[in-house]
Amino acid sequence: MATQMVKGNTAVIIGAMYAGCDCYFGYPITPASEILHEASRYFPMVGRKFVQAESEEAAINMVYGAAAAGHRVMTASSGPGISLKQEGISFLAGAELPAVIVDVMRAGPGLGNIGPEQGDYNQIVKGGGHGNYRNMVLAPSSVQEMCDLTMEAFELADKYRNPVVVLTDAVLGQMAEPLRFPEEAVEHRPDTSWAVCGNRETMKNLVTSIFLDFDELEEFNFYLQEKYARIEENEVRYEEYLVDDAEIVMVAYGISSRVARSAVETARAEGINVGLLRPITLFPFPSDRIRELADGGCRFISVEMSSGQMREDIRMASGCRDVELVNRMGGNLIELRDVLEKIREVAGDSSD
C-alpha cells in the first residue's frame, strides 16, 4: 500500500478517483480550489470528464445532469460558493439523485475571509436549500479521512440516491499528512435502471423534482422522511476516546476534535475523567449515544469553530440538558488552553 505526503484537498480527489467518480464540475474558490485543480490535472488523464464551469450555479446543475445520466459525479466549494449551490442541491435531493459535494468551510458570514471555521454546520446538516430534505453529512478529521470518507460518500450517495456532503474546513484542506492510498479502486456498477442514459431501455424514465399535484408532493415528502429515518437507523458513525469512565464528554468534529483529543490527554494527566465523542456523521447525528451518556450522568462540552450550532443538537440529544461551549470564530483556531480551562471549570462545578 503506497503512502505519500499530500494535502487534504488533494486527498479528496484521490478518494474520488479510487471511488470511480467519472465527472467533476466546479468553480474555483479559496480554500477549496486545489480540489478543482487536481481534478483538472488527473481526470482527463484517465478519460474522465472535467469542466470548470462559468459559475457555481452552472457547476451544480452540471452535477444534476451527470447524476441523472447515472454517472458518479462530484463538486466542491466553500462558503459563498456553497450558498450559490443550495438550489441545485435541493433539486438533487428532490429528484433523488446521488452526488457528492465537498464543503471546505471558511469564515463568514458574507465574504468573511479564507480562514477556517465550522459555521456552515446548520446550512449543511439541516439541508440549507428549500424544502423538506436532508443531506447525508460526513466529517473527516484527518487527511486520511479526507480520502476515505470521500470514497464512502459515493457509496452512500448511490445506496440512498441522495446528496452526500463531505464537510471539512480550511485547515484540513490545506494541511499535509501521510496518506495511505486505497488498496484497490472501486468498479462502479450501481443499479442505474432509474437513470436517463440516452438509450431505449431508459426512454421511459423521468428524473424530476416537480409535482403539480399537492397530494402527490405530500406523499413524496413523507416518503423522503421515511428514507431519512432509515439513514438515521443504519448509518450513524462516531468515534469515542476514553469515554467509558468519563464524567465529562466533549463533542467535537473536524479539526476541532484534534484539539479536543489533546485536551483529553492533558486533563486525564491531571486526574479529570474526561472523554471525547467525535461524530463522523453529522447527519445522521449520534443522538442515541449522547442520550445514553447523558442518562448516565455525563456532562457535555461542545468544542466547535462556530457560534455553537452543533451545541443545539447535543442539547436536544441529551434531553435539553445544559451543554457548555468552547468556540472560536472569524478564522481563529480553538487553542488547547481554552479547552482545558473549560474542562477544569466544569470539573470544579461537578465536585462542588
Swiss-Prot record:
Q: Might you name a Gene Ontology BP term for this protein?
A: sulfur compound biosynthetic process
| Keyword Oxidoreductase on entry | yes
Does the record carry Oxidoreductase as a key word? yes
This protein's source sits in the domain of life called Archaea
Note the InterPro entries from the entry: 2-oxoacid_oxidoreductase, PFOR_II, Pyrv_Fd/Flavodoxin_OxRdtase_N, THDP-binding, Transketo_C/PFOR_II
Q: What NCBIfam families has UniProt attached to this entry?
A: PRK07119.1
Whom does it interact with, and what assembly results? Heterotrimer of the VorA, VorB and VorC subunits.
Q: What is this protein called?
A: Ketoisovalerate oxidoreductase subunit VorB
